[in-house]
């Protein structure tokens, strides 16, 4: 009703204010610190997300309000919450992982410029083969050290525990369940979250084996 509409308007106003501050901050600190804000609010007020819930309601026979209540904690479960501090800490970890191999990266300048243009203009997912942990650290180190938008990555929900889970969630990792075939609300939330990130030009990285 009117209360929901007022809440939505307040959310949009606050989001626009935060966006303006975020753009100004990135102009000072760099593109690497571009992080998504108000993701859950953006999903909840998304016409596409609400339409998908209505369609699921018709399919399952469950009320939309019930599906909406189920979706709320699932958003908290899957949505990463990156911050500048943890992006810096993750960059240090990436460099440490490279220490025993090749401390400095060799980068093709022309391809780097091409990648920068792609990330700026298109929804992007960077795919890599996951043979060692350094493979996963390579894309995130590359984008951080060259002031490109941070990469959201994927990890199994079994890794989301205590200090490690919080560290990686705050540096852009999306923890997903290993199996969710019979969990339609979870699938809907995850699908729309990923679509939201890509639409906002937040790139993803994903291992083929994942």
Task: Describe the function of each predicted region.
Residues 1-210:
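Membrane-interfacial terminal anchoring regions of lipid-handling membrane enzymes
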């Amino acid at each position: 009703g009117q209360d929901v509409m007022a809440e939505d308007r307040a959310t949009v106003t606050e989001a626009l204010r935060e966006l303006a501050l975020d753009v100004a901050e990135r102009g000072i600190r760099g593109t690497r610190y571009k992080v998504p804000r108000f993701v859950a609010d953006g999903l909840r007020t998304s016409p596409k997300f609400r339409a998908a819930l209505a369609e699921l309601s018709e399919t399952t026979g469950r009320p939309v309000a019930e599906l909406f209540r189920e979706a709320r904690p699932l958003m908290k479960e899957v949505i990463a919450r990156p911050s500048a501090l943890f992006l810096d800490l993750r960059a240090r970890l990436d460099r440490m992982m490279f220490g025993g191999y090749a401390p400095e990266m060799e980068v093709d300048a022309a391809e780097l410029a091409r990648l920068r243009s792609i990330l700026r203009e298109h929804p992007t997912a960077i795919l890599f083969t996951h043979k060692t942990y350094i493979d996963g650290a390579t894309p995130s180190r590359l984008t951080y050290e060259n002031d490109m938008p941070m990469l959201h990555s994927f990890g199994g929900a079994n890794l989301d525990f205590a200090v490690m889970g919080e560290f990686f969630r705050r540096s852009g990792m999306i923890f997903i369940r290993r199996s969710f075939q019979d969990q339609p609300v979870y699938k809907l939330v995850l699908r729309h979250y990923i679509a939201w990130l890509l639409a906002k030009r937040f790139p993803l990285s994903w291992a083929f084996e994942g």
